[in-house]
């Protein structure tokens, strides 16, 4: 299990990572579910992403989450390909995997993520979507949303 001090550090990072704007953590209880083996970030592909400093936000998060790597498998979903190409070395160095599995999805719901882990018994599976809003200093663009999906799979499921 991740040390409590590191959990708090990660929480502070999530709450302060948008140096490029402001954000609101909608669910303050996320640490209750943020404790096993896997974190999945989902960046829904909006046209707005073309106007957002995604690279800077990700660089900041990557630097902070490097120390979490021993405790979690971190996967980043639906990163626009142009950002993925630029950030590939950084993501690899932080042991962060990425995929564009939602690019062809019409709704981008949690089952799309769950389908990637069919080999795992998901009966005690807990998933929660945390909605983070970034205020972007652009003339025509005010806000875009980033959904952090934390998938917590019990240790029993992983070994069954």
Swiss-Prot record:
Its main location: membrane. Keywords: Membrane, Transmembrane, Transmembrane helix. It is found in: Membrane. It is a multi-pass membrane protein. The chain crosses the membrane at residues 39-59, 136-156. The keyword Membrane applies. GO terms for cellular component: membrane. Belongs to the UPF0479 family. This is UPF0479 membrane protein YER190C-B. It comes from Saccharomyces cerevisiae (strain ATCC 204508 / S288c).
